[in-house]
Amino acid sequence: MRLFHLSRHLIQSKTFSLNRITFPVYSKMENNEKVLVGCIGGSGLYHLDNLTFVKTVHIETPWGKPSSPINISSLPSGALVAFISRHGSHHSITPSEVPCRANIAALKHIGCEAIIAFSAVGSLREEIAPGHFIIPDQIIDRTKGIREDTFFRGEGLVVHSMFGEPFSQKLNAFVAPRVEKILKETGDVVLHTGKTVVCMEGPAFSTRAESLMYRQWGGDIINMSVIPEAKLAREAELDYTLICTSTDFDAWRTGYDPVTVEEVVKVLHTNAGNSRAVAAGILQDVHDVVVEGKTLTDIKGSMKFACVTRKDIQPEASRKKLSYILPYFSD
């Protein structure tokens, strides 16, 4: 959190039933409309620039509706990208209430293989000033267990996904130099990499004691959104990279007032413009590298071996439900 815009066009729907519950299922994109890259916009970032609108897709997944309709837009090359606004089209969904399972499931179901997510963050380090960009490579989870953080809970299956490297290392490495180049051209904005993001529950900001504790733990930035988004992307076998924009210094600096919404909003406008420039500048390259298959080698197929429950005792209804995001559960 720390605070993308959509139109209409329904795609054809059918339904399937699980335990007497009927879910609408929407037809996949046509082959020439395959969407490989999804964008999730955070606070202040509600649309993308320099793209041609194609359609809006309204989907209801087995885990409910996404936080916004999915906007499908075309890059100058004709390649398609999908966009979801994490907190809703009008920023009406709190961090704890974001339907992350539906967001990730919807993007996977329409064909996405990689996600570029954006998030406003607070800085826990003096060198990460408001306006700076950060691509983290680690997460400290300080959420409270009230968010739905797995596709497998209650399904009669025990699944342990690999999460030692919570972001796609290859996609991070691919994106970082491109982001840095764009930021220098945009206005000499600083990019930090190799940082750790703390994800807190919210919606209140940190106490000063908490902020100081996160610094001692090795946290560099703090937000309210990366968990469970990153965990669910891993379970759906999607490459996931988070591009963060610093808006404030949280509450750790003695002699300064703790962060306020007013302070955050002052920086959001500039950060959002830079984020749109970054997205417009990297999406084609990300699409191309996904087409070439250079980023998914460590993730694709990994969940097949993460399930420790024997196939013959896995509930059929659960397998059918999970096949929405992991097709091999339909085998």
UniProtKB/Swiss-Prot annotation:
Substrate binds at M224, D248, F249, D250. InterPro entries: MTAP, Nucleoside_phosphorylase_d, Nucleoside_phosphorylase_sf, Purine_phosphorylase-2_CS. Pfam families: PNP_UDP_1. CDD domains: MTAP_SsMTAPII_like_MTIP. Its main location: cytoplasm. Its EC number is 2.4.2.28. The keyword Nucleus applies. It catalyses: S-methyl-5'-thioadenosine + phosphate = 5-(methylsulfanyl)-alpha-D-ribose 1-phosphate + adenine. It is an enzyme of class 2 (transferase). One of its GO terms (cellular component) is cytosol. It comes from the Eukaryota. GO terms for molecular function: mRNA binding; S-methyl-5-thioadenosine phosphorylase activity. GO terms for biological process: glutamate biosynthetic process; L-methionine salvage from methylthioadenosine; purine ribonucleoside salvage. The record marks S206, V261 as: Important for substrate specificity. Keywords: Cytoplasm, Glycosyltransferase, Nucleus, Purine salvage, Transferase. It is found in: Cytoplasm; Nucleus. Pathway: Amino-acid biosynthesis; L-methionine biosynthesis via salvage pathway; S-methyl-5-thio-alpha-D-ribose 1-phosphate from S-methyl-5'-thioadenosine (phosphorylase route): step 1/1. Phosphate binds at S43, R86, H87, S119, A120, S225. The keyword Transport does not apply. NCBIfam families: MTAP. Homotrimer. Catalyzes the reversible phosphorylation of S-methyl-5'-thioadenosine (MTA) to adenine and 5-methylthioribose-1-phosphate. Involved in the breakdown of MTA, a major by-product of polyamine biosynthesis. Responsible for the first step in the methionine salvage pathway after MTA has been generated from S-adenosylmethionine. Has broad substrate specificity with 6-aminopurine nucleosides as preferred substrates. Belongs to the PNP/MTAP phosphorylase family. MTAP subfamily. This is S-methyl-5'-thioadenosine phosphorylase. It comes from Cryptococcus neoformans var. neoformans serotype D (strain JEC21 / ATCC MYA-565).
